[in-house]
Design a protein with these regions (language model features):
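Conserved CoA-thioester-binding segment of acyl-CoA-metabolizing enzymes
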Residues: 1-40, 76-79
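Terminal peptide-recognition signature
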Residues: 4, 18-19, 37, 49, ...
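Charged catalytic carboxylate motif
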Residues: 14-18, 73, 80, 178, ...
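Glycine- (often His-adjacent) and acidic-residue-rich active-site loop
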Residues: 24, 39-80, 96, 208
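Hydrophobic alpha-helical segments typical of transmembrane helices
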Residues: 66, 73, 77, 132-135, ...
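Crotonase-fold acyl-CoA enzyme core
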Residues: 79-192, 225-226, 231-234, 240
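Helix-loop "lid/cap" segments that line or gate small-molecule binding pockets
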Residues: 148-149, 200, 218-224
Length: 244
């Protein structure tokens, strides 16, 4: 849970490091099946901490080293979510802007409250949302992404769902229960199979059509050989619940 509402849950250096560490640790815990990223307050995540960025300009190099390190840390966090062996769900209640919108786009799934809003407003500040663009452009259509990036306009939950930035939106009162229902449904599946599937999904989307089919054919062949596939198929034939 992002727990810095006084600073609008901005991705400070400390927040970036903490989130990265939590994702890393959760990846290796067998007891954890699904990761949910939620937030306290009425802002899910406002992006980078602009006060920290402004303060860094007082460094001898005008902040050059700090800025490179900051954006590298943020990029590593987003990649750790994609590379995490567990599905990651964003539970968005409130506003998600800039790197906060990037965080939502980087998660495997995202459910928001109906009142939530999203934006990549860096262009309005003279600082284009270049790293958020990576996650955004890989999750929504190019023209929808470019419109958000070039205008900096805020979009509502309905539009966010239309462009596939989020999976769905519900009332604030039902948000947590809806997310938990989704998380529990996934948690009932074979963790080994989910891990194989998530990794294969992100790997194949970067490949050509023929290479993607060659790669996924190998993945499925190997998957078919493991114990969970054997148990799953047997339980289906026997009309019983599988035991993973």
């Amino acid at each position: 849970t992002l727990n810095d509402p006084d600073n609008k849950n901005s991705l400070s250096e400390e927040m970036l490091l903490n989130l990265s560490q939590i994702i890393k640790e959760a990846s290796f815990k067998k007891s954890i099946k699904v990761i949910v990223i939620a937030a306290k307050g009425d802002v899910f995540c406002s992006g980078h901490n602009l006060k920290e960025i402004t303060a860094a300009r007082n460094h001898k190099d005008n902040g050059a080293e700090y800025f490179k390190d900051l954006f590298d840390k943020c990029s590593l966090l987003m990649q750790s979510i994609v590379n995490c062996s567990k599905p990651v769900i964003a539970e968005v209640c409130g506003i998600a802007t800039a790197a906060g919108c990037q965080l939502v786009a980087s998660c495997d799934l995202a459910i928001s409250s109906k009142s939530s809003k999203f934006a990549t407003p860096g262009v309005n500040l003279g600082l284009f949302c270049s790293t958020p663009m990576v996650a955004l452009s890989r999750n929504v259509a190019k023209k929808d992404a470019m419109k958000m990036l070039l205008t900096g306009d805020m979009i509502d939950s309905h539009e966010a769902k239309r462009i596939s930035l989020i999976n769905d939106y519900v009332s604030s009162e039902n948000l947590t229960s809806t997310v938990m229902e989704l998380a529990n449904k996934i948690a009932e599946k074979s963790s080994k199979t989910v891990k194989i599937g998530k990794e294969a999904f992100y790997n194949q989307v970067e490949l050509s059509l023929s290479d993607a089919y060659e790669y996924t054919s190998n993945v499925m062949a190997e998957n078919t050989m493991n114990d969970d596939a054997k148990e799953g198929i047997s339980s289906f034939i026997d009309k019983r619940k599988p035991t993973w």
